[in-house]
Amino acid sequence: GLFTLIKGAAKLIGKTVAKEAGKTGLELMACKITNQC
């Protein structure tokens, strides 16, 4: 029912946020390594 829908949406949002955060983190590390921050 509704609970399953909310749980599914939360999981999807969590995945998206994690992916974006991971991408940002990698970019930050790359610019620190190359000293281009």
UniProtKB/Swiss-Prot annotation:
One of its GO terms (cellular component) is extracellular region. One of its GO terms (biological process) is defense response to bacterium. InterPro entries: Antimicrobial_frog_2. It comes from the Eukaryota. Expressed by the skin glands. Has antibacterial activity against E.coli and S.aureus strains. The keyword Transit peptide does not apply. Pfam families: Antimicrobial_2. Belongs to the frog skin active peptide (FSAP) family. Esculentin subfamily. Keywords: Amphibian defense peptide, Antibiotic, Antimicrobial, Disulfide bond, Secreted. It is found in: Secreted. This is Esculentin-2JDa. Its main location: secreted. Disulfide bonds join 31-37.
